[in-house]
């Protein structure tokens, strides 16, 4: 299984270090490559220091001036990854943000193994009761089965959220997808480590530091 963690961010700095501390404890750490996509050329140089905390031999830090803005930037980042050919050699691309911490990966790895040979292209989580809201902060896809860059379609004209855009493009192109259970109630609020994938989308980094200290990871 060849896996890429495609981490897309803008202004995050310390998040990368904290992300790497969780990752070092996981199966994924020795079985994935890292690509950090940052669309902020004014980012602090500290990002390089924290990027170096990742132990992967195959890792890249990509900083670009291309930034479609708050609503569009995340979709644009994944589209650019597709256009640059970054994904094509991988069985799975796991897209997430630097403040979406993978605290455990047993369930995640099981999903990847069990679905490796089938024709499901996207693996989606829900974090909102809206059935057309496909979480954009974390999703998985098989690039070898995705022959069209669906992220480019209507990229600079869509007016909805990235979550609704992801849903709409998957439906428009009739792409086979399945849902991965994340929150038991399919709702991110309150922010917490979800009950299934054990992801933690947390903006309060003091809470993250405390959790890492409790696990003796700092």
Predicted feature residues:
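Active-site-proximal specificity loops/subdomain of glycosyltransferases
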Residues: 37-88
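Conserved donor-nucleotide/metal-binding helix-loop-beta segment in metal-dependent transferases, i.e.
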Residues: 103-133
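Catalytic core and acceptor-binding pocket of nucleotide-sugar-dependent glycosyltransferases
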Residues: 136-218
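Short, well-formed alpha-helical segments that are part of the catalytic scaffolds
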Residues: 12-27
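A conserved hydrophobic helix/loop-capping motif in glycosyltransferases and polysaccharide synthases
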Residues: 4-14
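Short beta-strand-to-loop acidic/aromatic patch adjacent to the donor-nucleotide binding site
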Residues: 89-101
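Short loop->beta transition adjacent to catalytic acidic/histidine clusters or analogous donor-positioning motifs
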Residues: 2-3, 26-36, 59-60
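Short, charged/polar "capping" segments at the starts of alpha-helices
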Residues: 13-17, 41-49, 107-108
């Amino acid at each position: 299984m060849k896996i890429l963690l495609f981490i897309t961010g803008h202004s995050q700095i310390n998040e990368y270090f904290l992300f790497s501390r969780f990752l070092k404890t996981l199966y994924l750490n020795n079985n994935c490559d890292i690509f950090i996509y940052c669309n902020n050329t004014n980012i602090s140089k500290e990002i390089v220091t924290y990027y170096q905390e990742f132990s992967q031999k195959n890792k890249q830090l990509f900083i670009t001036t291309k930034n479609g803005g708050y609503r569009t930037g995340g979709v644009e980042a994944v589209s650019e990854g597709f256009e640059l050919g970054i994904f094509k050699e991988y069985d799975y691309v796991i897209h997430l943000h630097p403040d979406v911490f993978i605290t455990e990966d047993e369930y995640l790895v099981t999903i990847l193994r069990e679905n490796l040979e089938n024709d499901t292209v996207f693996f989606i989580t829900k974090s909102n009761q809206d059935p057309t809201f496909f979480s954009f902060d974390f999703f998985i896809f098989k690039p070898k089965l995705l022959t069209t860059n669906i992220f480019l379609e209507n990229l600079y004209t869509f007016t909805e959220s990235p979550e609704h855009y992801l849903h709409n493009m998957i439906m428009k192109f009739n792409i086979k997808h399945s849902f991965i259970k994340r929150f038991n109630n399919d709702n991110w609020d309150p922010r917490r480590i979800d009950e299934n994938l054990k992801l933690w989308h947390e903006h309060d980094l003091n809470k993250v530091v405390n959790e890492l200290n409790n696990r003796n990871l700092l």
